[in-house]
Amino acid sequence: MNRNQILVRNIKHLTDARYFAAMGVDWMSMELNGDPTSFMRWHTFKDWVEGVKLAAEIDTNDEMLLAKAVIDAQPQGMIFHQTGGSAGMPDMQLFFDLTASDGQVELPECSIRIMTYHPLIDMLSFLDLDPHTTFLQADWTTDMLGTLLDAGYKGGICFSGGEEDATGMRDYEEMDELLERLMS
């Protein structure tokens, strides 16, 4: 059975990393920046989770940071917030966050675009997009996600990591429902 690919963005703690890996998501991303602790956190996550591909989320075109991310973190994917920083990237999956643009940006071949979905926007425009190269991001509800999936959307879905209620604790009831709807 083919199901929608799932990318969980902005993972900040091991509670989320372990939960989403156990739930069988396809991708998780975390921000890498000039702060050395972001790389230490990356390596901790990489050691703790299995079976999920990791993408580095870079919010700059700083070539030194990109090089450090590729060499030190060795991600399987890279999420860019601008389109200019991807030239010369090694063989990895490239994602482009187009949530702040109109989506009409020229992207490198085989890259994936991340777009904002809103239920008031014409759903048919999303159904016409290539499901292999499109992920939709929103503040999902089970009804909103169900409507999109029932209409025939086959592309990827983005969720975001969240804050812990207390160290090592978080309520995943709503996320359980969303993931169950996606994987059923």
Regions found by a protein language model. Give the residues of each.
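Conserved N-terminal beta1-alpha1 strand-loop-helix module at the mouth
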Residues: 1-85, 120-157, 161-184
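Structural motif
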Residues: 77, 93, 111-112, 133
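Phosphate-end processing signature that detects enzymes handling 5′-triphosphorylated RNA
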Residues: 90-98
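Ordered hydrophobic segments in well-structured contexts
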Residues: 95, 113-114, 135, 158
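Internal catalytic-core helix/loop-beta-alpha segment
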Residues: 97-126
